[in-house]
Amino acid sequence: MQKVDQATLDQLVEDLNKEPNEYVVSKWIVEKIPVIFNGDYETFIKTKLSIANKLGVDSCSIIFVGSSCTGFSLNPDKGFKVFDEESDIDIAVISHHFFNIAWRWMRMQDVTLLNKRAKNGIMQHKKHYIFDGTI
């Protein structure tokens, strides 16, 4: 498993220690051209616009997150693993409309009617994501 270079980690640690959380999130995720675009701003913007148009949201509501954005995993269990061909691309859609639809759907599910795998998946999702504002 390839890991991120030490200089990048040192910069992240320095930012985490010296800067407000809002700055760190903006610099490393929200305001960053994701590494999957190799610095190609035009393709990045066109991709965001395409996704936003298909979902009916503003392109500012589309945020690439995770290792596809930073170039490495921020998950402490993954040891700063570098984004590679086996990595997925995580995209956050910031939308009250879609959040409410998903929230209602999730709350209305009768997990007793689902198979064990589906039931466990929904219960894990509720436990780890929903109450943090993520669906």
For every predicted segment, state its role.
Residues 1-87, 94-135:
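Catalytic core of pol beta-like nucleotidyltransferases
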